[in-house]
């Protein structure tokens, strides 16, 4: 239903943000930017 769709899209948005932030952090830590 609609609720599941909303939850799924929210979850994937949060995942995308987390992955992006982790990439930036790893970039800074390793100096591989």
From Swiss-Prot:
Keyword set includes Disulfide bond: yes
Tissue specificity note: Expressed by the skin glands.
One cellular-component annotation, GO: extracellular region
Main location: secreted
Domain of life from the UniProt record: Eukaryota
Localization: Secreted
Record key words, sorted: Antimicrobial, Disulfide bond, Secreted
Disulfide bond annotation, renumbered to this chain: 27-33
Biological process annotations from GO: defense response
Keyword DNA-binding applies: no
Stated family: Belongs to the frog skin active peptide (FSAP) family. Brevinin subfamily.
Function: Antimicrobial peptide.
Protein name per its UniProtKB record: Brevinin-2Rk
């Amino acid at each position: 239903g609609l609720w599941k769709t909303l939850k799924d899209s929210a979850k994937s948005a949060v995942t995308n943000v987390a992955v992006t932030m982790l990439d930036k952090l790893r970039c800074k830590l390793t100096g591989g930017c």
